Amino acid sequence: MFYLFHFIFKTVIFYTMDWEKLSMPEPGSLVAVGMSGGVDSTLVTLLLKEHGCTVVGVTMSSWANDLPLPPSAEGVRGSCYGPDEAIDIAQCKAFCQQLGIEHHVIDVREAYHHHVLDYFKAEYRNGRTPNPCINCNPNVKFGALLDGVRAKGIDFDYFCTGHYATLVRPTEDLRLVYGDEVTGQETVRPVMISAATDKRKDQTYFLCRVPSATLEKVRFPLSVYTKQEVYAMAQERGLAAASRSESQDFIPDTYLDIIFSDQISQPGDIVDLAGKKLGVHRGIHHYTIGQRRGLGVSSNRPLYVHSIDSQKNQVVLCDDQDLLCSGLVAENWVWAGGYAPKSSFKGQVKIRLASPAASSTIRARGDGSYEIIFDQPQRAVAPGQSAVVYLDGIIFGGGIISREIR
């Protein structure tokens, strides 16, 4: 049985706010499901069909077939972008035929190339550490894909995916939470993203840049389940996708050197904080802040990447304690409801997926950027990564880290 839930919970910041969880698609509603061939989206498709929805499967095609095959096929499967895309599409189409529902392939190659591949390469070549998944979600998965679905005349009521996240809406004006003055007749009550039941699979960080307006029609049916429960339900229903490995990266490791082969990598100096040469790097796109392995230098103590200077083509190394930062500045923000807070406020900030959210003070700088000061120093703040502001597990905004504060 497919269970639907509605609940109210509280958080206390400056103002006690109630939040309501968005209801799932009603029986009879037209639902487009973003399908990848994995167990999550496959199960979502079936659950919605069982629930009585009119379901249409949609799969994006991003592989441009413009890269040479890697020397080894090992690791090609299990990534979002790769030459085996046709296998995934065929599996999705076959499953939809089995259910007796429509399936459409949406060409997103141009958008994917621009917003993911070009962005990924440009950021690394500028000495920054990009997050391609965060850029892909608003521009491709919840952007070009939905544009393509609508272009086919599919006027869906809801768009569902297999993401592990929850969608909520404040019961009062969002500005009250920040302590900002509430003016005008329009109430700011946007759709916002909250953690799912399975905290180990939580994907909210990756969704931080999807606009609230887009989220109005989005639903995440797996938000109330753990991954273990998802596998159990898939196995009970005999889904072949239950035996498929999860995708881990957006591109196979074997393709990393290939996608950067459009420009010759320029070796440069590896130096310490004093400027002393320690070795030679093989191209700055091979390095990221906090990296320890694969540096290619000999030392009697552990060394880490402190910073990357694209102008000097240098990789700077340091001791572990030199990675600590008191804060950061982030720009290019996407705030819930498009409302940028004016007041300073307390929140929790994640600076990478694997790190817990750190208690911080968030302050507007007057130029669209925000300064984040941590209560406790944080390690290895990497320009190019996303700083995501949470309050009680709910995303209020996400910005791109422009620099660290030491």
Each language-model region and where it sits:
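ATP-dependent adenylation/nucleotidyltransferase module used to activate substrates
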Residues: 12-208, 235
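AMP-forming adenylation/ATP pyrophosphatase catalytic core
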Residues: 25, 36, 160-166, 171-406
